[in-house]
Structure formats: structure tokens, C-alpha cells
Amino acid sequence: MGMTIEHYKIGERYNPRAREKKWQEIWDEKKIFQTVQGDGREKYYVLEMFPYPSGRIHMGHVRNYAMGDVVARYKRAKGFNVLHPMGWDAFGMPAENAALQSKVHPKTWTYENIAVMRGQLKQLGLSLDWAREFATCDVDYYHRQQMLFLDFYQKGLVARKVAKVNWDPVDHTVLANEQVVDGRGWRSGALVEQRELTQWFFKISDFSEDLLAGLEELDQWPEKVRTMQKNWIGKSQGLLIRWALKSTADDAGGSNDVCEAFDEVVCYSTRPDTLFGASFLALSVDHPIAQSLAKKDKALAAFIENCRCGGTTTAALETAEKQGFLTPLVAVHPFDETVHIPVYIANFVLMDYGTGAIFGCPAHDQRDFDFARKYDLPIKPVVLPRETKVEDFVLAEMPYTGDGVMINSSFLDGLTPQQAFEEVAKRLEQQVLHGQPQGKKTVQFRLRDWGISRQRYWGCPIPMIHCTSCGVVPVPRADLPVVLPDDVTFDQPGNPLARHEMWQDVACPICGQPAKRETDTMDTFVDSSWYYARFTAPFAPEPVEKQATAEWLPVQQYIGGIEHAILHLLYARFFMRAMKLVGHVSVDEPFKGLFTQGMVVHETYRDDQGWVSPAEISIVEKDGKRCAYKLTDQSEVTIGLIEKMSKSKKNVVDPDDIIASYGADTVRWFVLSDSPPERDVIWTESGVEGAHRFVQRVWRHVALSAAVLKDVAPRAGHQGAALELSKAAHRMLHAVEDDLEKFAFNRAIARLYEFLNIMAPLLNKVADVEDEMKAALRQAMDFFLAMIAPIMPHLAEECHAALGETTLMSELAWPVYDPALIVEESYTLPVQINGKKRGEVTVAATASETMIKEAVLALDFVQAQLVEKPMKKIIIVPQRIVNVVL
């Protein structure tokens, strides 16, 4: 296996390029990262979000996969049977865009990119089970996805319905609400339009309550992510209120043909306590009343059309200017029939939330307040803040949205808003309008069904057939997979499948008559909603193997960006529940632990021509200030903000270049060392050089001491300096273990720098120290290599071999610390005088309260204070603090 270093000369620099490749080949040859099913050890499944094969990996990938690899290698060393797979999230628009621009087939483009990126990932020395690799565009994978679709369809979890959708006019496809950001398509950046199309939906809303309740169990997820999902699911408890409608023509004694069909409207409200502050009703532009009125009113029809130019999402509606169209209808107040409230059609009311109609109380809601100010409507406060007098309460520039006491509200006056809610509900449930109760308590969810239809080629075909006689029918399971045709053209935007007659033409599986295939493909978020389950048995004939999922799921540790907090993570949680319902799995949640890592960021540079890349400049210190100059002509370049690495701003660093210059271990060490893993890491050349110097320093110390240490058996010291070294080593091992368990990689790295500093002077004179110290040094070095191995695996292997070992570091068990050696013999307590810290005292670990008191009273700064004032008492909190009260 070539695990010796005799050809190195003493003092020769470590050559990462040659060494790293060697160890990667040895790991591959021995298949040490291939996971064995049915192994008796405790299982641990660690997974990083798999990448989209865009062409090259970036530093964000490196950090993400380095984190996952540290966890995988550490858990393997701790005796777990680790599953750490890799695959490719390979369907999607960029491949079609490349086909349009470069005239290369999406399949060719995708698989070529996968080959490049696989090579890049392998250079990083990741302990991945490559035998389980798949791409979601593999026919084998999307065949199983089509099987899942049919299973869901048979269970009633798939619906086909006409829906208003977000249409991306650049990508010529439908976007889910979650894929619209600030009214624009998440990929194209185009302003989204609203269209009505017949779409396929997964009925995720059936699981709203369960998805919400499940969040309580996910205590190993960031609180922020759980909150985001909670808000997205959006459970609210409110009241359905039926309002009688009248035409303003009635009040004027005119004709009542305005809207004879509508004598009432139902509003949903989470704040029925504010009913006496209502000054308008607002209906969605899609409400049946709005549609009916628009048939007779051209101005209203034009208003509705104009509203449809914006996005359909809540976010889009919240940011758009509030607009309303006054109708010839008024609503009769449920508790006072003499009060008539104007009815508007408004652009900020969603038809698919609640009932598509709301009542506005401007005094206590920002949106209603803005609307009332714009249309000069009354703003009547009905909730008074506590400890405030009515005459002092003025709503000048903003509504009051806090708690308080009801005012200006008839029989509700003096109640709290919560009590008023219940009172209004009770009265309206007993009050009758047109033979039915006028109010009803209800629970609503914001979560909508997941529209999965996409009008594009490079996605998983939806296995349905359209027959003029039989309607829409599923493709028989035996006829799967529905394979994408290769002979498609990309000479125009839109879906090539819709133009491919031969592929579409098929016999109806029920009546045998000519029929057409569904040309929509599935949203690519479907592909990533179950891949983690497929990894447990990637070649099973069924989508998942129940025994394998029972063994491996949920994923113990999932790692990825917080940008997926809602979309991907919510869809994956839905998929697990759906797969459980159809009998494929026995667990509810896909991911037990979730870690969201920060980004890799870099300075930006620009000159008159635009953005400049780091490779094109040199940085020099001038008068104590950093200045940037172009390498070509030495012209000055402006140093801009530190931002996320992006091609558009040219502030990217190619991992290949850095690995070629410094080696993978240096890159891995740096991206994990500079800041806590949940925070952004700032990429700097000096930081990388510092990491590389550490690599060389480790190697130098091992190379210089190897001749002596290779023949020494490791053993803890029993006395003197050897004992002190062993104590430091065992404490360090204990602390680093704790850091790795908590994902505190940067803390572990800081300790390892410190530990090398402790060992260095002893290693420098290793030939001259006593045998007990040699044995303690050898044990300390073995511990050190075990601790750096998850982060810098190649260097650890090389050093391990240099010390005469023929085993692989990657297969070694994690060392065990001696509890007796990690006990602290003393500890330091902060000492306060009258609650202010004045100094510290160090006491023996076994010191009693009396001994601590004596030590504190003997301190000079305490003595000085006692001269001026006598002591009243001394408060001692063992292991925490001492407070002397004068």
C-alpha cells in the first residue's frame, strides 16, 4: 500500500498533491467508506443536501460537504455504522437554458457536469459511499418517482384542478408560491404573471395539522427554521361571520338589480373582537361577487385585470400598493342593522385563504389602516392599551396592535380582546341570518396544496394519459417508466414535449382508443423530497425498501442552507407522511437533526468596466490601508463589500485552484476554522495561507520526531512533566469530542492549534527526553492525529504511516480518555464586592466553603475594602461565584 515515508528527507516540505491522491486511491481500493447493510453496529445516517450539477462545485459546496464529512468520519471512529451517500439533484431549468443557448442536449449537459463535479468532490477526500450514487434524471430513479406518484394518486393524495398560478414569462413555466421572491421568479428574476391553468397538485394541505404538530418533536432543528415552517403552515383560529348585503340603490329608493343573486357574504376573521371598529369589507378580485359585478361594470373589470398583473403570493400582495374598488353594495353590521359598511373589491385579499372576504378594522391592523387612510374611511379605536385613559388615546400615524381593554364596542366594553372574541362568537352562533347561525368558530391554515405541474422538458414525466372517452387516467404500473424522449428541439422557449406528437400519442389503457400523454413534468422539488429514502436501498425494485428505511431513517444529521427552510424541508416532511400512508415507510419525519451552515463570502472588487475577480488583482498595504491593483496594468481597483460568492460579482474562488495550490486538507481546515459553522466564513488568501502553514508545521514535527516515536509504545505519564502532558492530552481529547458532537468545528480547531503548541517544544527534543515522556508524547501524538483526522484526513494518514503504523487512520477507533486524567485539580472563581467583580480566587477542586471563605478573605483587594467597612456576609455559590457584601 506504499504507506512509508522513507523517501522524504528530513525537513522536506509536505507535498499535498501527491500524498492526497495516494490516500484517496487506497481508501477506494479498500472500499472502506462503503456502507454494509445489516451490520450489527448502531447506525448513523449523515447527509448533506445533494448538489445541482451546474458545472463546477463552489466554496459553499466545499464547506457544506466538509462539515458532513467531519461528522461522518468522527461517528465512524466512534463505532457507528455510518451511511454517508452522494447523488445529484439533476433535473431543472438551467439544463434547458443551456440547450437553448449552447445547442447542447440537457441530458448531455447534465451528465458531463456530473462527471466534472464528481471528480472535484473526490479531490476533497470525502468519505462518501460512491457505490450508492444516482442522479434524479436517471431513468431508474424517476421510474420509481412515477411509481410513488401513482401510489399517491390511488390514495387520493393527488388532485387535478383549475387554479390561478404564478406564470414565469421568461422561463415559460409555472412557479409554486414559495418560488416567487418579491414578485419575481426565483431563477429568472422575471416579474410573475397570474394565469388560470389546469394543474396537478399534491394535497399537502391534508397534512397541515400533522406537519405543524410534528415540528414540536424536531428539537434538533434550529428554532428559526421551525418558526418559518410554523408561520408558513399558518394555523389560525377565527370566526366565519355572515354579513347581510344590501345595494346602495335600496337606500336611495332605486332599482335593486345590482346583485340580486347575492344577499350575504361570509368573512373569515381572527379578530372578531374588533367588529365594532369595522369600517369596510374587502373582497378578493376572484370572489364570485366581484366576478358577477364585473360583468356589468367595465371599470371594475379593468381594475380586476390590472390587479392580475402582480404575483399571487402573500408576499407579493403585502408589498404591492393597497388598491380598492368601491362597489354598489353595503354590508349590514351583525350587531347594529342601522350601520351600513361599504364593500370594496381589493387587490390584497387572497381568494384561497379564508373565504376571500375580510372586514377591515383600521385602528388595529396596519394593512387596514393603510387602506382606510387612502380611501378616507373612519378609523375607530376599539382596543384601549392598559393603563391608558380614553381621552389620552390617539391613533396618529399607526394602528394599535397590542392587547388591552375593549372600548366603543357596546356590550363588549371592559372585556379583554380574548373575552370579546368568545362573546362575539357565542352571540353570532345564536343569532340567525337567512335561517342559519350568523357565526361559526373555525380553524384555518395558510398552507395551500402543492402545485407540481411544470411546462418543461427536463423533469420527471407525470404518468397520466388524457383520453377523450375515459378522461384522465393513470399509466398502468406495468407500463412504467414513461421515459423522456431524446429527440427534442430547443429552438424556442416553452415545453418541447407539448410539440412532440409522436411521444404524446398513446393508446388509452382503458378503452384502447388513441389518447395523449400528459406533457407537464413534475416540479424538481419532488425529486429532492424523497432521495434520502432512496439512498437507503438505491437499487431496490420498489421506490424504497421498507426494511432499509426502518433501519436508517430518519436521517440523524442533515446539513444544508437555511434558504431551503420552507420549500424543500416542508415538502420532504410531507413526502414521508405520504409514503407512510401508502405503506412504503414506517416513520413520519425524514430528518431528526438539521444543521444550517453559513455561506462562504468574499470581498468584491470593481473598476470602471465593472466587477473584477480576486485572481485579477493584487492587494498591497499603502499608508496602513489595503489597496487593490489590477495585475495587467496596475490600475487601482475599488475594494467593495464582503458578499456571498457569486459569478455575477466575480468574487468567486475556484476550489480546484486552491486544492492545486494548497491541497484539500488546507481548504477543509480553513473553511471550518474561521467562524462558527452556522455563520458566514470570510474567504481570505491570508487565512488559507495560515491553514497551509499549520499543515506544514504538523508534518515537520511528525517527520522530525518519527524516527524516535515510531518504536515507542503509547502510554500516559505518571509523574512530573510527562503526567502534565498526558493530562493536557486527555483533557484536549475530551473537549474536542464535545466540540465535534456540538458541531463547534472552529472551537475544536482552535484547541488543536493550542495542543500542537503544547507538544512542539517536547517534540523538538524528543531524542533527549526520558522514556516515560517519550511514551506520553507518543500517546499525545496519536490523540492529536485522531483529532485532526476527521478534518484533515490525508495529513493524518501520512503522519500515522510516518510513525510506523500499517493500519489506516480512517479505520481506527476514536481514542478513549482516562476520566482520572481530566479531573481539574483547581478552579478559578470570580470574586464580587457588593455585586461588582473585583478579582478572582483559585481554589482546590476539593475545597470546602470554609476553605473558599478563608482564601477570599485573605485576598489583598478584599482586605483593603474590609479596612474601610465591615463585612455583613459572604455568599458562596460553589464552582460559580463569590460575593462579599459590605
Swiss-Prot record:
Motif ('KMSKS' region): 644-648
Molecular functions per Gene Ontology: aminoacyl-tRNA deacylase activity; ATP binding; leucine-tRNA ligase activity
Subcellular location: Cytoplasm
Top-level EC class as recorded in UniProt: ligase
Major localization listed first in the record, in broad terms: cytoplasm
Single Gene Ontology BP annotation: leucyl-tRNA aminoacylation
GO cellular component, one term: cytosol
Keyword terms of this UniProt record: Aminoacyl-tRNA synthetase, ATP-binding, Cytoplasm, Ligase, Nucleotide-binding, Protein biosynthesis
PROSITE patterns: AA_TRNA_LIGASE_I
A Pfam family it matches: tRNA-synt_1g
E.C. code: 6.1.1.4
Catalytic reaction annotation: tRNA(Leu) + L-leucine + ATP = L-leucyl-tRNA(Leu) + AMP + diphosphate
Motif residue range(s): 'HIGH' region: 51-61
Binding annotation for ATP: 647
UniProt similarity note: Belongs to the class-I aminoacyl-tRNA synthetase family.
Name of the featured protein: Leucine--tRNA ligase
Organism: Bartonella tribocorum (strain CIP 105476 / IBS 506)
Origin organism lineage: Bacteria, Pseudomonadati, Pseudomonadota, Alphaproteobacteria, Hyphomicrobiales
